C-alpha cells in the first residue's frame, strides 16, 4: 500500500506568468489601403461596396501586415496558391514568432535551455512539422523540450494554450521538478486576404473577416516556481483556473475552412448576440469550478474582477460589456488592443495582458483578480482567472 505524502511534502500547486511579449507585423494596413487593394483587382459589386462600407466603420485605427503596401502580394494578378501561402507564413510568420518569444524570454530573465515545455498555437498554417519545431531550433531550446502544437481553435487559442501549459506545469509540480513553459501564438491572416477577396467576388457573399484580422505573434513564459533563480522575474499573475465551455447548436456560427487557395473565414452576424449569452454563462462556470472562489456569492459578480475580453469585433466587445454589467473602462485594454491592431486571432489576448501589465507598472489601480474570455470556433468559450501575487486565493483552485 502506498502511503500518502505528508501535507508539508505536497508541492504548492501554483503556476505563474513570468514573461509577456508581443510583436505585431511591421506594416500598417488601414481602411484606405484595403479599399485600394480591393478596387485594384475587382470591379464594383454590391458585396464589395458593402464590405468596404463595413471596413470604414470598424473603429480599428489600423491593422498590421507582414506585407508592405508595395509588396508583390498585393499587386500580382494571380491569387497565391495554398502552397505559396504556406511558404509566406514560414518566411514572415516564423520570424515574428521568434522575435516575440525572444522578448518574452528576456522579460522572464531565464535562458532558452531552461524552457521545459513549448505550447504553440496558430490557425493560419498547417505545415508538418509545425512552426513550433522550427522555433525550437531558432531559439536554442533543448532537443527534448516537451512540445504541443494546437490548431483548429481560432480566437480562443491564446487562452487554450495557457490552459494546456498550466496543466502540464501542474503535472511537473506533482513530480517535484522545475518547469518553465513558453507559450507562442502566431497568426498571419493577411496571407489569405487575396483569396478571401476572390471568394467574395465569386460568391457575392459579404465577408467581414476582410475588415478585422491582422498579423501578430505573442508569447508568454509560465513557471511552476520550483527552482526559482534570482535572475527570474517574480510572478506577474498566478493562474487560478482555466475553463473551456462548448455551446451546443453553434457549430455553424464561425468557421475557418480550407480551400485550394488557403483558408476562408465565415463569421456569422449572430456572434455578438451569442457573445452576450455565452460570456456570462462561461464566467459563472469558471467561478463555480474554482474551489477557492465557488462558495462566496460575491465572487459571481463580474464587476468585482478586472477583464480581458477578446475583441472579435467592436460589437462583440459591446455585447460582452453590456451582458456582464461592465463599463468601457473595465474593458479599456481590450478596446485599445482592438483599435491598435484589430483582431489578431489567438495572439490578441496576450497583447491585452501585455497592456494591462504595462499599465500596472506605471501605477494603474487594477483589481487583484483578472478574468480572461475569448470565443473561438465551435463555438467554444475559453476562460481563465488570474490573480496578483500576494492576494487571496493564491493557490491553484
From Swiss-Prot:
What does changing residue 377 to F/P do?
A: Leads to complete loss of catalytic activity
Please name the Pfam families in this protein's record.
Chal_sti_synt_C, Chal_sti_synt_N
Keywords for this entry?
Answer: Acyltransferase, Transferase
Q: Which residues form a coiled coil?
A: none
Q: What is its EC number?
A: 2.3.1.-
* Active site residues according to the UniProt entry: 155 (nucleophile), 377
GO CC: one term?
A: type III polyketide synthase complex
Q: Which residues bind CoA?
A: 50-57, 267, 312-315
Cited InterPro entries: Chalcone/stilbene_synt_C (IPR012328), Chalcone/stilbene_synt_N (IPR001099), Polyketide_synthase_type-III (IPR011141), Thiolase-like (IPR016039)
Question: In UniProt terms, what function does this protein have?
Answer: Acylalkylpyrone synthase that catalyzes not only the polyketide chain elongation but also the one-pot condensation of two beta-ketoacyl units to produce the 3-acyl-4-hydroxy-6-alkyl-alpha-pyrone (AcAP) scaffold, a precursor of csypyrone B. The enzyme reaction is initiated by the loading of acetoacetyl-CoA onto Cys-155, and subsequent thioester bond cleavage by the nucleophilic water generates the beta-keto acid intermediate, which is placed within a pocket.
How it assembles, according to the record, is:
Homodimer.
Q: What is the name listed in the Swiss-Prot or TrEMBL entry for this protein?
A: Acylalkylpyrone synthase csyB
Native source organism of the sequence? Aspergillus oryzae (strain ATCC 42149 / RIB 40) (Yellow koji mold)
The major lineage groups are: Eukaryota, Fungi, Dikarya, Ascomycota, Pezizomycotina
**What gene name is given for the protein in this entry?**
csyB
Amino acid at each position: 500500500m502506498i502511503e500518502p505524502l505528508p501535507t508539508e511534502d505536497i508541492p504548492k500547486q501554483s503556476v505563474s506568468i513570468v514573461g509577456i511579449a508581443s510583436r505585431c507585423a511591421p506594416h500598417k494596413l488601414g481602411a484606405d489601403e484595403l479599399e485600394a487593394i480591393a478596387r485594384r483587382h475587382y470591379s464594383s459589386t454590391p458585396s464589395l461596396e458593402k464590405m468596404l462600407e463595413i471596413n470604414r466603420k470598424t473603429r480599428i485605427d489600423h491593422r498590421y501586415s507582414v506585407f508592405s503596401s508595395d509588396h508583390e502580394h498585393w499587386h500580382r494578378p494571380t491569387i497565391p496558391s495554398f502552397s505559396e501561402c504556406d511558404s509566406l507564413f514560414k518566411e514572415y510568420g516564423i520570424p515574428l514568432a521568434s522575435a516575440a518569444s525572444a522578448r518574452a524570454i528576456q522579460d522572464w530573465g531565464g535562458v532558452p535551455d531552461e524552457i521545459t515545455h513549448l505550447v504553440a498555437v496558430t490557425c493560419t498554417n498547417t505545415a508538418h512539422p509545425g512552426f513550433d519545431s522550427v522555433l525550437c531550433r531558432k531559439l536554442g531550446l533543448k532537443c527534448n523540450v516537451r512540445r504541443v502544437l494546437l490548431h483548429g481553435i481560432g480566437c480562443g487559442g491564446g487562452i487554450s494554450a495557457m490552459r494546456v501549459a498550466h496543466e502540464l506545469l501542474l503535472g511537473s509540480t506533482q513530480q517535484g521538478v522545475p518547469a518553465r513553459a513558453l507559450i507562442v501564438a502566431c497568426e498571419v491572416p493577411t496571407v489569405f486576404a487575396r483569396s478571401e477577396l476572390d471568394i467574395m467576388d465569386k460568391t457575392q457573399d459579404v465577408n467581414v473577416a476582410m475588415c478585422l484580422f491582422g498579423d501578430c505573434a505573442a508569447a508568454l513564459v509560465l513557471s511552476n516556481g520550483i527552482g526559482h533563480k534570482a535572475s527570474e522575474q517574480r510572478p506577474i499573475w498566478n493562474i487560478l483556473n482555466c475553463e473551456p465551455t462548448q455551446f451546443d447548436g453553434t457549430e455553424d456560427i464561425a468557421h475557418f475552412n480550407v480551400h485550394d487557395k488557403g483558408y476562408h473565414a465565415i463569421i456569422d452576424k449572430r456572434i455578438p448576440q451569442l457573445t452576450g449569452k455565452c460570456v456570462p454563462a462561461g464566467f459563472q462556470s469558471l467561478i463555480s469550478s474554482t474551489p477557492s472562489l465557488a462558495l462566496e456569492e460575491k465572487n459571481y459578480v463580474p464587476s468585482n474582477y478586472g477583464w480581458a475580453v477578446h475583441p472579435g469585433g467592436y460589437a462583440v466587445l459591446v455585447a460582452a460589456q453590456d451582458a456582464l454589467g461592465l463599463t468601457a473602462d473595465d474593458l479599456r485594454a481590450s478596446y485599445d488592443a482592438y483599435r491598435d491592431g484589430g483582431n489578431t486571432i489567438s495572439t490578441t489576448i496576450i497583447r491585452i495582458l501585455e497592456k494591462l501589465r504595462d499599465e500596472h507598472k506605471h501605477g494603474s489601480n487594477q483589481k487583484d483578480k483578472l478574468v480572461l474570455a475569448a470565443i473561438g470556433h465551435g463555438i467554444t468559450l475559453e476562460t481563465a482567472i488570474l490573480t496578483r501575487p500576494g492576494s487571496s486565493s493564491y493557490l491553484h483552485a
